[in-house]
Amino acid sequence: MRHGKTGRKLGRTSSHRTAMLRNMVTSFLRYESVKTTDTRAKELRKLAEKMITLGKRGDVHARRQALAVVRDRAVVTKIFNELAERYRDRPGGYTRIIKAGYREGDSAPISIIECVRDISGTQSK
């Protein structure tokens, strides 16, 4: 039975999946937007939100936990200084996934995952 086994396998071994998600979260936090498949974006969102929440904690242990995943000091500094300050008053939901059609080669559904810019919580029309 598959009780308590959350997360998607993404057709990869566990080490390949972990490495891919680490690289993707590093790129996502550096550029604040990534174009990828729907399922990868959904897995990436979990990890990215956790990293930003660690940045909001701001202590040394949180910084070390973030470095264990991201492994790029410049990106970790950005998380703890810029992103943590931007989302200080926001209790989660730092990212959004926008459907972007289908990839030409294999018709895989493509999405753009990006950081939410509007921090007020209201939509502007």
Curated annotation (Swiss-Prot):
Keyword RNA-binding: no
HAMAP family: Ribosomal_bL17
Cellular component per GO, a single term: cytosolic large ribosomal subunit
Alphabetical GO biological process terms: translation
Annotated organism of origin: Syntrophus aciditrophicus (strain SB)
Record's protein name: Large ribosomal subunit protein bL17
Complex formation: Part of the 50S ribosomal subunit. Contacts protein L32.
Designated gene of the protein: rplQ
Keywords, ordered alphabetically: Ribonucleoprotein, Ribosomal protein
Family statement drawn from the similarity comment of this UniProt entry: Belongs to the bacterial ribosomal protein bL17 family.
GO molecular function, one term: structural constituent of ribosome
